[in-house]
Amino acid sequence: YGQVLEGYDFTGLIKEMKHTPVPEDVIYVPSVEELEALDIMKDLQNKGYGGLPVQIGYCNGHNKKLNAVEYHRNSEINVAVTDLVLLIGHQQDIEPDHTYDTSKIEAFLVPAGTGIEVYATTLHYAPCHVNEGGFQCVVVLPKGTNTDLTFQTEKMGEDSLMTAKNKWLIAHEDAKIAGAFN
């Protein structure tokens, strides 16, 4: 599914994240200027993505459920600011009709301060909180990921799962996620 990252100093990033909101639901912000201005940006871009332009954002809030899974064409780097649980699975387990059996999901505790690489073929979505104060998670992806599509997709095959740039999403029908494949 991924690996724990070594050789990064996330101290400044974690400190800056203390200024981000932790709502009662979940918020995702793909790119945050204050996070991208930190020294760690160069390390993440060069060591983590081989020099590709990246964005640093966050996913924060309170969550106790799996209502969707997504994947990208590249790894995602997460830094747990608080303890959190990731619910993850394998892209290869998506059925030909683009459904996914959630009984195959596994839960992993990511301790606060830990940086991880979530491989491109790993299904994931918003973390679950461990403590009543909610969760805070840094999200690093290639620049433009999870932003609005600027082109039309044919809503057939795998393209029917694309809801944003570099984002393929399968949602539970009760989640009512706009544009998602249910």
Task: Show which residues each predicted segment covers.
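Active-site region of the double-stranded beta-helix
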Residues: Y1-A112, A126-N182
